[in-house]
């Protein structure tokens, strides 16, 4: 195994070759984690944006199962599933299918278009330039984070994130956007393991087999993660499980990992030295 690969695996915490029995154990472990954290913080609810993708569908169902468990114990708790489209989402029916599977305590739709377009206009007025599609995509992700914290802020709920090992290693999230959350119940799982957990939870193939997409770009709606990364999730997952992958793919993945280190840390201070290495 490559030296950096071993280091990354220790950091990400992925267990190789997960079986269905182990997946069921992981479901239970993560439901209990959510319950324990809600009780420890005194919070009475959770908020999560639901896109219809694999990760938010899995995290959403785990949240609802945790909330159901606490309610059965007499501790009134709720899960608010938030739809956060920019205008009209091209795969809206997938999001609705995810909501039917999750069965959240309540759901609401917060369309971010007006906020993002207003920022777009203000940006042009301030800089004299048109915001790039990529930069605007990050604005969308951060607007969604703001919306979720606004929904959570009134009742004092916690915001749930969907980051997992296959996204963390690549830094494939927006800093202070979808990377902003109070708890990450999918940490330590890779993409195929997220799919496996959804399967053992009874999700339809339409949900667990959906091609992952951040869907942030106006110019390329629905562009897949794999196309954007130039790597496949099977390659990333194999690497995270300690398996050998194509040399060029491994080198590219490690380069992306090193380049995105700043996303996996708190803001750098004068006392930090990791960035010097």
Residue ranges and their predicted role:
Residues 2-170:
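ATP-dependent adenylation/nucleotidyltransferase module used to activate substrates
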Residues 28-31, 96, 195, 233, ...:
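Generic alpha-helical structural signal
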Residues 78, 104, 136, 144, ...:
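Catalytic subdomain that performs nucleotidyl-dependent activation
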Residues 213-251, 258:
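Long, well-ordered amphipathic alpha-helical subdomains in the mid-to-C-terminal portions
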Residues 243-277:
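Intrinsic disorder and flexible/low-complexity segments
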């Amino acid at each position: 195994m490559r030296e950096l690969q071993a280091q990354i695996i220790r950091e990400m915490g992925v267990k190789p070759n997960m079986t269905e029995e182990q997946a069921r154990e992981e479901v239970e472990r993560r439901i209990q984690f959510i319950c324990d954290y809600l009780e420890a913080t005194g919070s009475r609810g959770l908020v999560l944006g639901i896109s219809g993708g694999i990760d938010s569908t899995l995290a959403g169902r785990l949240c609802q199962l945790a909330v159901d468990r606490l309610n059965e114990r007499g501790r009134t708790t709720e899960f608010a599933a938030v739809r956060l489209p920019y205008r009209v989402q091209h795969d809206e029916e997938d999001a609705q299918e995810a909501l039917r599977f999750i069965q959240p305590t309540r759901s609401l739709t917060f369309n971010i278009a007006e906020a993002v377009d207003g920022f777009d206009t203000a940006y042009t007025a301030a800089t004299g330039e048109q915001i790039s599609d990529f930069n605007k995509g990050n604005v969308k992700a951060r607007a969604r984070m703001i919306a979720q914290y606004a929904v959570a802020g009134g009742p004092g709920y916690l915001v749930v994130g969907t980051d997992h090992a296959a996204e963390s290693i690549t830094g494939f999230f927006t800093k202070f956007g979808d990377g902003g959350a109070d708890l990450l119940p999918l940490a330590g799982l890779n993409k195929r393991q997220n799919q496996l957990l959804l399967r053992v939870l009874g999700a339809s193939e339409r949900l667990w087999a959906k091609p992952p997409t951040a869907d942030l770009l106006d110019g390329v709606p629905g562009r897949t993660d794999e196309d954007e990364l130039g790597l496949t999730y099977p390659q990333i997952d194999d690497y995270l499980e300690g398996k050998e992958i194509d040399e060029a793919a491994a080198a590219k993945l490690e380069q992306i990992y090193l380049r995105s280190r700043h996303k996996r840390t708190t803001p750098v201070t004068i006392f930090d030295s990791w960035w010097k290495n």
